[in-house]
Amino acid sequence: MWWDILTLIALLVVIMGLFSMAMYSIGGALGMDKDTISAISYIGSFLLSISAFYIYRNVRNGKPAALRTIARHRTSPQMLLWSFLTIVWLGIALEPLVSMLPDKHFASIDALVQNSYGALLSIIVAPILEEWFFRGQLQRSLTNKYGAMVGVTVASVTFGLIHGNPIQILTAIPCGIVLGFVYNHTNSLGAAIFVHALNNAFSFAAISILGSSGITLCDMLEEYRTIYWIIYTSSVLLGAGSLLIMILKLRKKQ
């Protein structure tokens, strides 16, 4: 079990690391701007990782996600909306913890929003490639062998850690659990991609409007403390409750 998991994660880390280093060296020599190099590195490394996973799973007689799983049935608008709102509620619940992190971590997120290709990468490219990789390959492969809880947990933790930024790690792991539930429940990458894209679009728009990822709901409602605590308490209860329901549903599929 652990050999498979470590091999899959190592493939991702090594390929992304080596390809990114190669692109920055080649791009720098060719005089390419940093935004373009970052975009090519991100897209190229994920495409190579996906290809490597297909080869590895075929060798191990696994069943990687096929393109036909992009569109499947059993997907209701209510479930997609609930999943998106759960991510928002969990994000609000984690704000006090996230706000304690150094400003430099917020600056790196702001830089992504200001990137020339920021909107394209965040709202379109990232949801497609990341869901195809983490849910469609890593989660599905592990679920087929070890069950839904192992598949979702490992894929979610890896999904969070691969972001690198402590802020994104804290928020991406629970987000990954929600997205893992969506994929497991619907067997549709399209559903997971949609929720991921909706969340990224919401976050991108909020940061663009507010001017910084470091501005919290608490900051915005500084003069309306009662309203803030009502929203915050509700978000904690709804987010934790929804996440618990999703986890219990996943456990039933073990």
Descriptions of predicted regions:
Residues T7, L11, W82-T86, L121-S122, ...:
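Alpha-helical transmembrane segments of MFS and MFS-like solute carriers/permeases
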Residues I15-G27, L48, A52-Y56, W89-L101, ...:
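Alpha-helical membrane-inserting segments
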Residues I26-A39, G62-W132, Q139-R140, N144:
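Juxtamembrane helix-loop-helix connectors linking adjacent transmembrane helices
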Residues S116-Q254:
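Transmembrane helix-loop-helix hairpins at the membrane interface
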